[in-house]
């Protein structure tokens, strides 16, 4: 799960620099964490980044990982992302 998250964040960061400052990245992370967003909705959001079946499968697997988490874990991921956005390393962006 961690590897998939890193790969998705790396791919999206190529599209726009975040720190937060990138509404697209923030929206994707929010939709990734949100258990109310289905895998179909999630794929529609990321359609412009999907080139092949391998990417589609990776996106499905990433979303499924988050759908299988408890509310507490999802809440902790939100806190973690906010800590990253607020970190001094992201001030550079």
Curated annotation (Swiss-Prot):
Glycans are attached at residues 53, 68. It comes from the Eukaryota. GO terms for biological process: androgen receptor signaling pathway. The keyword Glycoprotein applies. It is found in: Secreted. Mammary gland specific. Over-expressed in breast cancer. Keywords: Glycoprotein, Secreted, Signal. GO terms for cellular component: extracellular space. Residues 1-18 form the signal peptide. Its main location: secreted. Belongs to the secretoglobin family. Lipophilin subfamily. This is Mammaglobin-A. It comes from Homo sapiens.
């Amino acid at each position: 799960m961690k590897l998939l998250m890193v790969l998705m964040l790396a791919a999206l960061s190529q599209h726009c620099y975040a720190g937060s400052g990138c509404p697209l990245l923030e929206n994707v992370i929010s939709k990734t964490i949100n258990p109310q967003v289905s895998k179909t909705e999630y794929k529609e959001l990321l359609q412009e980044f999907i080139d092949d079946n391998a990417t589609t499968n990776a996106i499905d697997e990433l979303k499924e990982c988050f759908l299988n988490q408890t509310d507490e874990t999802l809440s902790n991921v939100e806190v973690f992302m906010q800590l990253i956005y607020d970190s001094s390393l992201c001030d550079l962006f």
